[in-house]
Amino acid sequence: MLSDKLKDKIGNYQDFPTTGILFRDITPILRDQKLFSELIEKMSESDILKKADCLVAIDARGFIFGSSIALNLSKPFILARKPGKLPGELIQSSYKLEYGENSLVFQLDSLKNFKSFGIIDDLLATGGTVNAVANLLNQKNKIITGLSVVVELTELNARSNFNFEVSSEVKY
């Protein structure tokens, strides 16, 4: 089963990046091209992403999966970035992390030609970054078809804060 293979690869680092956090490291998946390819194929099968006009991935590890899935599905792809990383006219939303606070921005013109968006990230923890993206999309009256992540930390129950579907390949 894919989720078991992924769990075998995911690294676990206690007290990283701060004390009390158990960091789930997805980078070993990327070193196994067969497993990475299998994961991209599986995530690409999601109706959440298939029915979206455009895919949006969250800075930075979400870009790895989002760009591959967008190519696989022949979908346009945009970035939700941290401040100071994108030029042009931007819209911004702040969020709290499990271990801090930050903001995300979109280039305003990247949203104008699309009605619906599927969100992609590597990991769902508290849901702060996803809520920031959802807030930005909602500000512009866009439809969110759902969220697709590699890993979901279910004990934090972030999915209960969303009014859209969530798909995760691995649950802890």
From Swiss-Prot:
InterPro entries on file: Ade_phspho_trans, PRibTrfase_dom, PRTase-like, UPRTase/APRTase
Pathway assigned to this chain's UniProt record: Purine metabolism; AMP biosynthesis via salvage pathway; AMP from adenine: step 1/1
GO cellular component: cytoplasm
CDD domains, sorted: PRTases_typeI
PANTHER family: ADENINE PHOSPHORIBOSYLTRANSFERASE (PTHR32315:SF3)
Subunit structure: Homodimer.
GO molecular function ontology, one term from the record: adenine phosphoribosyltransferase activity
Broad class of where this protein is predominantly found: cytoplasm
Signal peptide: none
Record-listed E.C. numbers: 2.4.2.7
Protein name: Adenine phosphoribosyltransferase
Annotated TM spans: none
